[in-house]
Amino acid sequence: SDLARVKRIGYDNWIDEQFKLPIQSSHLSTVEFSASTLGQSQAYAHNVTHSWWTHAVREPGQLRQRVAFALSEIFVVSTLTVDDGRSAASYLDMLTVHADANYRDLLEAVALHPAMGQYLSHLGNRKEDGTGRVPDENFAREVMQLFSIGLHDLEDSGRPRLVNGQTVETYNANDIKGLARVFTGFSWHWPSAKSAVEWW
């Protein structure tokens, strides 16, 4: 059985073996095939769900699939906001590829993916100007609060660090404003529907 084999070769060897397995197919190709088979003009959320189950059951690299799923629960996008199933499928592919990446590369890939740009509104984010426009702070706030350092400084034990009985904030409003300035200018080339360019 699989469990007996893991016991025999050891956890470290099994993990290395799992991440060396090639990804058999992409969610994007599975979603497009599913939509085409059902006679749909585009892919929808149910096609993405079908793809996720297909890969979860059939992919030999089960560890990669499970890590990608766990990452999708942290770096959340919505098929309600991102209305093209190809976008969500491509996003799952990106998480699958980066399942064993370092955190810096993963966070960059998440930040640059159009699905996240649409969901947390930094796609097309513009710099401040003289009219009073300021950069959208939504993604910057989520990067700090949910995707990295969190609201409060923590001890090595994971408990909140206290100073004079009070928790210590890890960032403030000025930090968010500064980071929001970094996340401006992201956009994309949107080819026509007949274009061969794969824009997801």
Kindly label every feature range from the protein language model:
Residues 44-48, 58-66:
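Amphipathic interfacial helices
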Residues 4-37, 44-53, 84-200:
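Active-site substrate-binding loop specific to GH73 endo-beta-N-acetylglucosaminidase modules
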Residues 1:
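Mature N-terminal segment immediately following signal peptide/propeptide cleavage
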Residues 63-67, 79-87:
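Short, flexible active-site-proximal loops enriched in glycine and acidic residues
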